[in-house]
Amino acid sequence: MNKVALYCRPGFEKECAAEITDKAGQIGVYGFSRVKEGSGYVIFECYQEGDADKIARDVDFRGLIFARQLFVCGELLKNLPPEDRITPIIDQLKGSTEKAGELRVEVADTNESKELLKFCRKFTVPLRNQLRKEKILLKVENYSRPVIHVFFIAPGCCYVGYSYSFNNSPFYMGIPRLKFPADAPSRSTLKLEEAFHVFIPYEEWEERLASGMSAVDLGACPGGWTYQLVKRSMMVHAVDNGPMAPSLMETGQVRHHQADGFKFEPTSKNITWLVCDMVEKPAKVAALMTTWIVNEWCREAIFNLKLPMKKRYEEVAHILDKIRAELAEKGINAKIQAKHLYHDREEITVHIQNIWAAYRPDREF
């Protein structure tokens, strides 16, 4: 198996391909991408045998912006016989992986592929049973073992392979399944909820998304992102010239500042979270977020950067490099992650954690 399959949002295949080519080159792996626009996936074929596995191990999946999932795969299996689709899949997996902990039979995130989902669910059960008989899959799911992926791109056609649990997306199809809360002011609330799932390990939620923390939401109106903070019992400074949802104001957890998000400065030093979803040039938003981190006005920030029409990966990489350079120049040790989330469209979501910023327990509000 000398290929890597990557899932992405349909329409962003070129960005996904540019990114994996760049990241693979950084670890000395070279190859070429097969891209079909609108397909929702990319196949990166390595020149050297064994390099696909190296990518799966050594290219930090959490560091990829446009990929929703990454796994090693072999040649496309075509025209699987309806009377026995399982044997060719088993044959391709033999010798590639053993004692895997999980099976995922998946499709791309397109309207055409979603018609295959019903089949995938039915096919999973007999395939899982046979994989266990062949000892390719453990009898009991084990989330610390490799994951087997069977990725159908059309009826009877699939890529088969594996990913490592320490370097993949834990979500089926790489998409967190979130339900829109009926009382949320806008659907944008799902962006921030997804960002929490993607950027913050669940075991750290109790500490890093704790009740009673203070937060600032820049460009808050009508309150989609503020809703997520309030739901976690945080006290929120909502900054926007527009109106906030009355339901949020009635909680007593929100203070509305009718001001420009680019000019607002906090008066207290107890802000843990800064969130920002403003429609503005990405470089301007990035500069604002950098200022907040440098001044230690917050400990962690999640914000959106609107994507340009052309060279989207290159522009985003440039902006993120600039943030890293400015923070390093100021002696700030920060962890930066960025992802084109499922609930993002023409933007990406960025997370910055100031590792050395001490949380101050005083809670002025």
Curated annotation (Swiss-Prot):
Active site: 306
A molecular function (GO) term: S-adenosylmethionine-dependent methyltransferase activity
Main location: cytoplasm
Matching Pfam families: FtsJ, RlmM_FDX, RLMM_N
Entry's localization field: Cytoplasm
Listed Gene3D superfamilies: 3.30.2300.20, 3.30.70.2810, Vaccinia Virus protein VP39 (3.40.50.150)
Lineage: superkingdom: Bacteria
CC terms in the record's Gene Ontology section: cytoplasm
Binding site for S-adenosyl-L-methionine: 188, 221-224, 240, 260, 277
Keywords: Cytoplasm, Methyltransferase, rRNA processing, S-adenosyl-L-methionine, Transferase
Keyword Acetylation: no
Catalytic activity: cytidine(2498) in 23S rRNA + S-adenosyl-L-methionine = 2'-O-methylcytidine(2498) in 23S rRNA + S-adenosyl-L-homocysteine + H(+)
EC number of the protein: 2.1.1.186
Any GO BP: rRNA processing
Subunit structure: Monomer.
Stated family: Belongs to the class I-like SAM-binding methyltransferase superfamily. RNA methyltransferase RlmE family. RlmM subfamily.
Biological role: Catalyzes the 2'-O-methylation at nucleotide C2498 in 23S rRNA.
Protein name: Ribosomal RNA large subunit methyltransferase M
Upper taxonomic lineage: Bacteria, Pseudomonadati, Pseudomonadota, Gammaproteobacteria, Enterobacterales
